[in-house]
Amino acid sequence: MRTTISQLKEMKQNKQKIAILTAYDYPTAQILDKAGIPAILVGDSLGMVVLGYDSTVSVTMEDMLHHLKAVVRGSQKALIIADMPFMTYHLSPEQALLNAGRFIQEGGAQAVKLEGGVNVADKVKRIVDCGIPVMGHIGLTPQSVNQLSGFKVQGKTLATALSLIEDAKALEKAGAFAIVLETMPAELAAIITAGISIPTIGIGAGEECDGQVQVISDMLGMFTDFIPKHTKRYADLNGIITKAVSEYAAEVTKGAFPTLKESFTLDKKVLEELKKCVL
């Protein structure tokens, strides 16, 4: 039985923090399920951390569906939320609904996430009215990175802070079940969290949010070239994997792997008969 939308809302009411992580493949989804993560986000961040793009803008519906299906197969308990990629919901409420429907019907997701506030409220309402749960996303919205002039903290002025509060209320009114608050002052995130009835999920938005989401690759230390300020590294998988691969390569090179322990053998009689046939 998967986590439900109602359960996430109850967690906010009971002041129980919600831990969410991204996943992009079958084995990671299995691990997160085993660890008790209540909701998994199949984020368009896969464009950067899996596919090697410079931003999330290049991610397609087909990219998302491919990875979404793997995560759904690997999980049994977590609520699966799928990110709607750039330009898959921007044109009209109907376009948004059709693509959200694909994530539910083809991909097996239980909810979708899209970026924006007041400007996408009509799309959120159209999707929700057809029975598909929607998670909102405001603050630093990576799909708008070109318009925002990079990955910068949002809501630092009075005008932009008030605009983000308006965005959050518009998403709540449109029927969103939760909102991601990304890269904004902690004080602003706390005000937004207290001002709406639905859960807020922070990423670089302080400790007062109702929950937190992190990119799995960041918190496990898969990359060494860039560490987001909002990330705490709980492991150094880059170092662990590099060491393991180096040891493997060295053992193969010097003939130390494989050994008899990792090999299969013929019955002695069969081997003798085989040698007679070929030698």
UniProtKB/Swiss-Prot annotation:
Cofactor: binding details: Binds 1 Mg(2+) ion per subunit.
Pathway: Cofactor biosynthesis; (R)-pantothenate biosynthesis; (R)-pantoate from 3-methyl-2-oxobutanoate: step 1/2
Keyword terms: Cytoplasm, Magnesium, Metal-binding, Pantothenate biosynthesis, Transferase
E.C. numbers: 2.1.2.11
One annotated GO biological process: pantothenate biosynthetic process
Cofactor: Mg(2+)
Main location: cytoplasm
Active site: 182 (proton acceptor)
Reaction it catalyzes: 3-methyl-2-oxobutanoate + (6R)-5,10-methylene-5,6,7,8-tetrahydrofolate + H2O = 2-dehydropantoate + (6S)-5,6,7,8-tetrahydrofolate
GO molecular function, one term: 3-methyl-2-oxobutanoate hydroxymethyltransferase activity
One CC-aspect GO term: cytoplasm
Binding site for 3-methyl-2-oxobutanoate: 44-45, 83, 113
UniProt keyword Metal-binding, yes or no: yes
Enzyme class: transferase
Pfam entry (one): Pantoate_transf
Annotated Mg(2+) binding sites: 44, 83, 115
Compartments where located: Cytoplasm
Oligomeric and partner information: Homodecamer; pentamer of dimers.
Protein purpose: Catalyzes the reversible reaction in which hydroxymethyl group from 5,10-methylenetetrahydrofolate is transferred onto alpha-ketoisovalerate to form ketopantoate.
Family assignment from sequence similarity: Belongs to the PanB family.
Name of protein: 3-methyl-2-oxobutanoate hydroxymethyltransferase
Organism: Dehalococcoides mccartyi (strain ATCC BAA-2100 / JCM 16839 / KCTC 5957 / BAV1)
